[in-house]
Amino acid sequence: MFMIKLNKTLFVLLISFVSIFSVTQAQEKKEDKLSLSLSLNHDAFFGFNPAVTASYPVTKKTDLTFYGIQWGAGTARAWGNWTEFGLGFNMKAGDFAINPQLGFTMGNLLSSGTNQPGIVGDGIVPNLTINYDDKKNIGQFYAGYYAALRNKTEAGESTLNYVHYWLNVGRRVTPWLALGAHYENLNLAGGKIKGGGNTNSADYYKWIGPFIQVSKGIGGMRFSFGTDLTDDETSNSNSDFYKLSFFFNF
């Protein structure tokens, strides 16, 4: 009788263990679907600006996406430690991945032109990223509109709005080496001055030049360089174009 009860107890424990293990495995499989990418970026205007992106598949051709950029790690430290976070939806169409997102900034660049303390909800950033990869050719288009979400200006101060976009295309000449070209523009798209009037629009920079990318497995780096097409006397950037990125995919 004792042995029967013991066997039943062991059987129940075994079933419980198998059930818990199965649930744990299922949860781990779900968690494994989450993809993360880390980009350690450094350029002539923003300085160091690391970014993280995340995606979780909803269907075979769609993903829920998230992103964050620490602009304040570089020159944007003076803009209320400017920070950006957003989310969106990625759609795959052949060799294209189309990812509209909506971001928000924290800091003081957009809400007061860097004059007042940093705030949550400094700006809103509707943006679009389109990636192309057919195993041989690669490309990316990005466009974002940085608009002041809150107005924290005092008399004579202005909110600021920006348009930031780039396009790069390249070709893999070997499995680990890609060569291509990059164009990027940052434009001040105006703003409202407290007390009346608007801030004039102006190009901060227009970068153009080649890039070289080396990669293997989950990581790699890209170096882009060239010239700034804007007039140094009217732009906010007087440097040549150079940008270095280290990227890792998990």
Regions found by a protein language model. Give the residues of each.
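Outer-membrane beta-barrel transmembrane domain signature
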Residues: F46, Y56-K61, N90-D95, P117-F250
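Outer-membrane beta-barrel proteins and related beta-barrel translocases across Gram-negative bacteria
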Residues: K33-L38, K92, G103, I208-P210
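Short glycine/proline- and aromatic-enriched beta-strand/turn motifs that initiate or cap beta-hairpins
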Residues: Q25-G74
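Mid-chain, structured segments of secreted extracytoplasmic proteins
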Residues: W71-G107
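Generic structural motif
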Residues: L36-L40, I98, M221
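Surface-exposed, interaction-prone regions with an acidic/low-complexity signature
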Residues: N108-L110, A202
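Cleavable N-terminal export/targeting peptides
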Residues: M1-D32, F250
